[in-house]
């Protein structure tokens, strides 16, 4: 199993959202190549390594749980609930929907992965209990 970790010893940030964003950037660099002396089509030997936001989110949740053998990371009956409630902090939040915009679920998740910040986290739940939140 493969997952993303967000503890400080495993990376530079503790945010699961930032970890997912860094995975997107790293995968894009690997897929696109980084040698400026080569033409874009000749830069990469790994074009299939690109990761989308849905995959990055899965790696940061269910993938991480699977890699560690933990019974979390999914909304299923009988499974422990470790979750965060994400609500746009205000109208200027990067995750606030545009007026009249009707987004597909994958697009909404992409917006969350790319834009969620601490100010957007309303509540944190560990094992089903509310433990904290940026706006508590």
Task: For every predicted segment, state its role.
Residues 80-135:
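C-terminal cap of metal-dependent C-N hydrolases
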């Amino acid at each position: 199993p493969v997952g993303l970790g967000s503890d400080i010893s495993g990376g530079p940030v503790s945010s699961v959202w930032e970890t997912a964003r860094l995975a997107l950037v790293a995968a894009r660099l690997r897929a696109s190549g980084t040698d400026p002396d080569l033409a874009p089509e000749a830069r990469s030997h790994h074009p299939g390594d690109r990761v989308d936001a849905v995959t990055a989110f899965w790696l940061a949740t269910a993938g991480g749980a699977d890699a560690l053998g933990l019974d979390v990371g999914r909304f299923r009956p009988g499974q422990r609930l470790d979750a965060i409630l994400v609500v746009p902090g205000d109208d200027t939040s990067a995750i606030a929907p545009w007026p009249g915009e009707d987004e597909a679920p994958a697009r909404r998740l992409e917006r969350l992965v790319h834009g969620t910040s601490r100010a957007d986290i309303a509540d944190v739940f560990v094992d089903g209990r509310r433990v904290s939140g940026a706006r508590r």
